[in-house]
Amino acid sequence: MPLIRKPPSAAAPQTAAPALDARAVLEALARGNDDERWAAARAAADFPAAVPALGDALAHEKSPTVRQALFSALARIATPQSVETILPFLRSDDALIRTEASDALLAMRDVAWPFVPVLLRDPDASVRTQACVLVRDMPSPVAVSLCCDLLDSEPDPNVCAAAVEALAEIGEASALPALMRCADRFRATPFLEFSIRIAIDRVRSQVLNPRA
Amino acid sequence: MIFTEAKRYYVERRAVDRMLGTRSDSFEHYFGRLRADVQGEIEQFVNAFTVNETYFYREEHQLVCLTSDLLAARLTVKPRGEPIRIWSVPCSTGEEPYSIAIWLLENWPHVDEYDIEIVGSDIDTDAVALARVGVYGKRALMRLPARLVDKYFEADDGASWRILDDLRQSVRFTAVNLVDRANTRLHGKFDVIFCRNVLIYFDDLARRTAAENLFENLSPGGFICLGHTESMSRVSPLFDVARFADAIVYQRPMR
């Protein structure tokens, strides 16, 4: 019946590698192969001083696997400097990188939150759209009012749609007037009117049947 | 671990239990004890918060997938002679790793041709200690056919059954914290990891860290099975989705 015919100690391959020091981390981030860069990115989370090197590495990294570890290291360091290092990647032409950057910000929401209102006013509509997603996923007492303010002034219907989607998730009764004003403003944009109608129904049903 | 407002009662009840267990007369007194880790209180506190509700042959479809597809896929890329390594994490009180062992013995025709190492790990050291003992009540055995209970257990008394020694020695148990990389790395690389119903308790950052640790613990091409309500795609892009007839699992890419 035994499943092992030789002692487990002989059978178990070991993966424990010596811990990297800060210098070795920087060296491997800059010049290592895929496995070495992955290991260095993971180890870098223990070295807040590595933030600029992580940013440089992200700018050139081609491997999605290593990139994930680089974003995670910045999220684990979780300083305003690491948030600032991630923000430019919200402007990437690659949607995957934009999502990875957004996920990394969500993983350090307390540190990232102060940057979100600024992102909602960014000149780039796609950054404002990403910011609406962050607002949706970072619960905050001012999240609803931020979305409502945006709905009153935002010229781009796609950004408004992202804010409407956020309000459909987090909205409360106070959001209804802003949603209705936005529907009025975009009467000529049927998809947005439709989204707003759904969001209003959802907010109303949440007001009537609040979740536990 | 993350507990929302809805779990306040759950948290309070366990904190009160630990205060009683340590004869602390106020929360301040207990909190001081916890922070100083007096007599390993941090471990006791963590143990109090873990959920150890499970049973044999839970999510059997994944066990079917293991013997129908996953092991065959691993054998096509593994060097001959290397052991097959399977990790059950978290393993709670051992029902899952012992289920894997019984399932393999009953359902995998090649079971005698390979060394198969099954490791069960959990952060709850009390649960790990119980897993090593391997004594179970009726509820844990409810899904196991009576024939298998007779074959792999001996009746302790009318209400509990003990895993046979041979089978007990086929599973190695360890304590592990999934978000502690140094800790997970010590366990080596596995062909298949069962990691069910734990990532849902983590916050975003802990989930990312755990996913990356599990990625490192998988051999290239190795598989990870999550609970049926969980999706690795929502946690991490590191893994590929692998769809089989009996289960959807996740796979570390070969490269």
Predicted regions mapped to residue ranges:
Chain B
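Core SAM-dependent methyltransferase catalytic element
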Residues: 192, 233-255
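Residue-level signal for inorganic ion chemistry
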Residues: 66, 193, 218
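A structural alpha-helix within SAM-dependent methyltransferase catalytic domains
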Residues: 67, 101-105, 215
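Conserved SAM-binding loop of SAM-dependent methyltransferases across substrates and taxa
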Residues: 93-111
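Extended basic-aromatic, gly/pro-enriched interface segments that bind polyanionic ligands
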Residues: 89, 109-194, 198-209, 232-233
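Conserved beta-strand signature within the Rossmann-like core of class I S-adenosyl-L-methionine
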Residues: 220-228
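Conserved AdoMet
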Residues: 1-87, 225
